[in-house]
Every structure is written in C-alpha cells, then in structure tokens.
C-alpha cells in the first residue's frame, strides 16, 4: 500500500461524484484518489479518464473502483482498460473480487474488496483479495451496519493485511482514531462530495452544507441494498422518508427508475455530513484534515505523557 502519503486516506469512490478532476486533486494533495468506473457512461470515456489521470498524477497512487455484481455487463471491458492503464489499486464492490484478481495481479496491482460483514471479509480474502475496505455504519451510499471499532477488531483476528475502514469519518481526529484502532487507511467520501472538483451538482453540494446527521435515512427501498439517503432529496423526488417502500430487487443500474424517478437522482451522504460547511478545493480539505490529524496525535501523545508522570 502507498506510503508515505500526507494522510492515510482514500477519497472514496462515489457514484456520479468522483471524476478525474477530483481524483487528480486528491492525489496531488497527498491522499489516494479513487473513482467508480460506472461514472463513465461509455468505455471510450473511461479510456479518456484513465489516460488523463495516469498522465497527471505521475507516480502518485490512484484507484479504480469496479462493480463486480452480475448486473454489470460492462465489467469485461472495464477490466481490459484496467489492464491497459494499470491503476495501482483496484477496489471491487457489490460482488466478489475474484473477477479482478488475475487482471490486476498480472501487472502488479493490488485488489481491495469492499465488505460489510466479517463473513464477506473472509470470502474476499479466500478469493484472493490483497486487502479489505470495511464499510461500516455511518457510511454514505451503500452502507454497513457494524461499528468501525468492532469491525476492525474482528477482521484483525484473522487478517493482518491492508485494511481500509470507512463510515462517518469526517475529520482528522476520526482518521487518527481509526488508525489507532488497527486500520491502515480510511475511506472519506461525504467530505469530498462538496469539493470544488467533484462532479456533484451545485444543488447537491448546497444540500450537504445545510444538512445534519438527523437529515439522513438508511433504506433499501431504492436500490435493494441498504443505503444512506438525504431526506430532503427523497422528498424532492416524491418519496416520504417516513413511509419508504419495501426493497425491490437489486437495481444497481442508474438508469433504473423508482416511481418514475431515476434512483441516481436521489442524493446520499454519510453521518459525517455535519462537517461539510460549504464548497472548497480538495487540497484545502486535505490540509485541514492533516492539521486535525496531527493535533489528534499530539493530544494522544500528551495524554500518554501525563499518565506516565
């Protein structure tokens, strides 16, 4: 895994939010930039994005996120471009990492599997994943249910490889806490939705800046998988947060609709949403996180010194 970085952070790959501008800005600021390949509506666009990212980040690490669910008919084409452009890290989501293993290992890359349970973590390692991204309670988008501290501890009982943890971490102190608990890296998503370089529309960024944790709802009623949605966005799309429907079948294709609305038009956020105060460049966000991270480490060191005095 990449060291040294300014911070042990991945700007999490976010659907319809993470594009080349955000990936490049994150990498240049000293963290790992990532994007989901389905954000590109064509294989030609994906080729263009990867070409640009690779040219602009140089030797800095970056990450492509593949959806390995059986509904992703474009996966073989995406994998062909992964082989061509060789992102150092490939995160697999919504399915087994197995389809990506041979391609990524052939050029020396690392496969990280998104997991939401200990059972899935064990399956991912058995399938050949090099590392795990543990998606915990508090994450935006498709979310988890486990405490990050409990999840880290449970995984570390059988796995000592690279471990990313994500879910509600919105400041540098949270990053330091996750590292102290045993994670190697942290996923941060919601904080970067409002970055100037993200693909999110202005209205989405404004909604984030106005939102608090109470404005979130976890529901499987949109895509069939539990996800954390912004209540104001649900209402804007004609849904009642207090009366959500039963979960449909899996609907990971953004063109699929719910009550006449594309589910991709419903906006999500994680429990760290209250930390978003407005739109900023990614570099400014990273620099603030770094100051907070350093301050948290200093507090821990000072507390230890006091306890030994």
Each model region followed by its residue ranges:
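Conserved active-site-proximal phosphate/metal-binding subdomains
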Residues: 148-164, 170-309
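Active-site entrance/lid segments in N-terminal catalytic domains of soluble metabolic enzymes
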Residues: 1-162
